């Protein structure tokens, strides 16, 4: 009895475990699915190519900054906003800045390669002061006869063994004395640098250059009006190319750049660190007009075969100082707004002053004006102090003009690099150039920050020299990202069959078009995959077409410039990216598919989010960051599963001829069937002949003469049966005999008939046995199924009875407990009610 109870308990526990397993199994399995064309990207460094309209700016002169290797700009550039997307930018760690710096230096060097070296001019110069050849005076500017000097020197002519004496006018900043009497001079930097003369037809006019991303990459743009260059940006868009950036090389003041759309923006890598430069972007331009009033003439000095040095021959009129004019009202109001912004960071008096020292490129505002390199003293511009009261004062309405003096240098050391310098040939005639100040480069003095340096005053000085800051002021809102069109996510679909691919369609992800769904959920974005991946190959082909046009325009040069090399690199990179994605899709068995299911089960350890949460609440970018650490593992599992499927497919194809019985009746197989039939018949006939010959030989050896093949041999009856009957002499009608056939066809037919009868009987016996076995198994299975149903019903009844019994027991226990509680409460209540009676009874006894 005890054993029976244990057995029932064991059955109940097993049934409960079985039920829980069934409930757990009822949850649908998830499988890895590959999506191609998802809007996902990551930060990247890649080779950008350029676009510009160089022909529209200069048709004759060779421009230093842009060449015809740049593709033409897009007349209708596309910009696609990315709603619900927040992206981090960092202008101080932007590879686009470093790339532009290298490109501009490379273009500058390449432009000077064919130019003449002026090393033969590194000789002793005998210099003296010059005087004007005109007796007239002018009050338009300050007369400065000492800004230039007349130098004579000996130089080699076209015939190398002959020398002659020449003279030329040089700026005093370009020569240094070599003795104490200040008569003998030498060109500056001659002992330390290789000086090249800029080609006489070179133009330094900055042409806007657009940086573009190759196919497979994208440029993200931050459109927040008050974006300071670092941190997150909520208004993000994607563009094919940047805006036109003029490569203006200047210090202290940023010229001809872009202005802020909102208020003035202060940008610094660390505003509290005085070692970090500050880039100020203005929201309103300030015009600066520069003049070189001297009417110079240019002369050519032959230094040898094919080498001509261009120098200043003479100056017509008074020698007047080069200068620049700025509106005092505009500049004062600009500094007031800049000081207001700086006080938001420091809350002290803002003092602007001149640089403390350094190279001439740093302590002055250096830039190129009409081909001449000017170095202007900005002490009049940065000489003011702004406290709370002066900032709140009324705007300056004065119409005065600030004039800052400038100097010209012809020997220029570009990019602050030692060993290289250029000689800028003089420009004939008067020079006037107008520029717009769009930004400032400042540095802050250090000191005691307890009460603020200089009694609560922060001092700011103009700076420069690092051209990367110039490019940062334009590239602060851009970043390059690499498109990751391959995505994996869990779905309820599983790859069921293995099919051979019939065709592969070339598709890919373009760097602009499909990113519009980046802010949508994964479910919404996966619906538009076809639209998202349509333009990659067309983008690559268009890029190749632009490159061929650029090379065709420059084919006479016989070698590529920096921009041409970048075009080739961008083209190769785009093709490599496309082939890499297609290779992965091919390895996974997903060629030509936008959505490709696999038989790899989804592992919950890769992401603990639910299926609905993934597809309804997350974007593809968020999902990619969620599983970024497991992407390599998932890829390897998909590859292993595909390899296994290919092996299975190979084994299946090995049995391909058995998959279709109609192939057996193919006319191409008839000759093979006839050959097999003839071989079988021939074998049977051969065996029959051999056995017949052996039988005859055996009987001849026994002395027996064989009967004719037409004789019927009676079949001998059994020994215990009579040979006849009454009246008829025995029953002869039932006697059987063996017929010996005569002829080849009869013999073959008899053997084939016997073979078919034998096969039929054996096949019939096999079918009967199989049918009997299947019937037995079916009966047994039906009995087992009924037994299982009865068992489940029995245990269900047991569970029901147990539950009812438990409920009854609980109800009885609760009822009994409730009755006891009620009884106790009644007794307590009656005791309270009987208290007066007990008191009365006690008093009565006491009185008695």
From Swiss-Prot:
Task: Spell out the residue ranges making up region: V2.
Answer: 151-190
According to the record, the residues making up region (Immunosuppression) are 566-584
Keyword Iron among record annotations: no
Motif Di-leucine internalization motif location, chain numbering? 847-848
- What ranges does the record give for the region V4, renumbered to this chain? 376-406
Report the SUPFAM superfamilies cross-referenced here: gp120 core (SSF56502), Virus ectodomain (SSF58069)
Which loops or segments lie on the Cytoplasmic side of the membrane, by the record?
698-848
Residues under site feature: Cleavage: 503-504
Chain intervals for the UniProt region annotation (Disordered): 444-465
Q: Where is this region: CD4-binding loop?
A: 355-365
Query: For this UniProt entry, which residues form the secretion signal?
Result: 1-28
One Pfam family name is GP41
| GO biological process terms held by the UniProt record | clathrin-dependent endocytosis of virus by host cell; fusion of virus membrane with host endosome membrane; fusion of virus membrane with host plasma membrane; positive regulation of plasma membrane raft polarization; positive regulation of receptor clustering; viral protein processing; virion attachment to host cell
Here the segments flagged for biased composition (Polar residues) are 451-460
Q: Which GO terms describe its cellular component?
A: host cell endosome membrane; host cell plasma membrane; membrane; viral envelope; virion membrane
Give the residue ranges for region: V3. 290-323
Q: Which residues lie on this side of the membrane: Extracellular?
A: 29-676
Positions of the UniProt region annotated as MPER:
654-675
Any notes on this protein's domains?
Some of the most genetically diverse regions of the viral genome are present in Env. They are called variable regions 1 through 5 (V1 through V5). Coreceptor usage of gp120 is determined mainly by the primary structure of the third variable region (V3) in the outer domain of gp120. The sequence of V3 determines which coreceptor, CCR5 and/or CXCR4 (corresponding to R5/macrophage, X4/T cell and R5X4/T cell and macrophage tropism), is used to trigger the fusion potential of the Env complex, and hence which cells the virus can infect. Binding to CCR5 involves a region adjacent in addition to V3. The membrane proximal external region (MPER) present in gp41 is a tryptophan-rich region recognized by the antibodies 2F5, Z13, and 4E10. MPER seems to play a role in fusion.
Name the chain's protein: Envelope glycoprotein gp160
Q: What is the lineage of its organism?
A: Viruses, Riboviria, Pararnavirae, Artverviricota, Revtraviricetes
